[in-house]
Amino acid sequence: MAEKKKVEREFVEASTGKTGKGPAVVTAANKKSATGKRVAAVILWVLALAAEVGAILMLNGIWYIKEEQKMYWLIGALVVDLILVIIGSQLWKKANRLDPASKQSSVKFFLWNNMGLIASVICFLPIVILLLANKDLDGKTTKIVTVVAAIALVLASLFSIDFNPVSAEELAEAQQAVGTGTVYWTRFGKSYHLDPNCHTLMRSSKVYRGTIEEAFEANRTDPCDFCALEQE
C-alpha cells in the first residue's frame, strides 16, 4: 500500500483572507509569565526615568547638592538608571520570546521588539543633551559626567536591542514542525535540535531538553540544519 503523501496545510482567515501556517499556541502559563515580565519591565523603566529626573534636578540645582559632591551624586544616579534600564529590557525580551508579537501588525511588531531601545533613549538622551548645554558645572565635572552618561546610553542601547526578534509566525511554524515533541539545545549554541544524537551536540557535556516554547524562551529560535535534513 502506497504511503500517503503528507499535505502541507495552509490556514486562511475567513474575515481577512490572509494566509498562514496556523496560529502560535501560547499557553496560559506563558501568557501570564510574559505579562508579569512586561509589567515588571515597565515598572523598572519608570524607576529608571525617575533616576534620570533626579539627576536633572541635581544638575539644575533644584535638588541642592554641594558642588564638591555633585559629580558623585550625578554618576550614582546614572549608574542606577543604567542598571534599571538593562534589567527591564532583559525582562521585556524574555517576555517577547514567551508571547511574541505577530508580523501581521508591523507597527506593533516594531514597537514590541524595540521597547528596550526606546526606553534607553528616553532615560539617557535628555540628560546627555542637558549636560552638553550646561554652563554652571565646572569643566572637569561636566566632561566626566557627560562621558559617563554617553557610555551609559550606548551600553543601555546595546543590552536592550533584540538582535534576534521572534514573531508569532515563527513560533507557530516551529510548533507545527516539532509538535509536542522534545527539542534539545546547549548552553552556548544558537539552535534547537530535534535529534538528541545530532553530531553537533556530541561535544557538549551538558545538553538541555524541553518543549519548543522553552527553547524559544532560552533564545534558541533557529532549527538545526542537520536535524532538519534528517527529518526530511
Description of each model-found segment:
Residues 1-86:
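Membrane-anchoring hydrophobic segments
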Residues 57-58, 89-93, 160:
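Juxtamembrane cytosolic interface motif at the C-terminal end of transmembrane helices
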Residues 83-99:
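Membrane-water interface of transmembrane alpha-helices
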Residues 158-232:
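Mature, structured domains enriched in cysteine- and short glycine motifs
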Residues 146-161:
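Final/C-terminal transmembrane alpha-helix of multipass membrane proteins
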Residues 108-109, 113-150:
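Cytosolic-side transmembrane helix boundary signature
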Residues 64-69, 99-106, 135-143:
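Membrane-interface helix-boundary motifs at transmembrane edges
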Residues 71-74, 96-117:
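Loop-to-transmembrane helix junctions at the membrane interface
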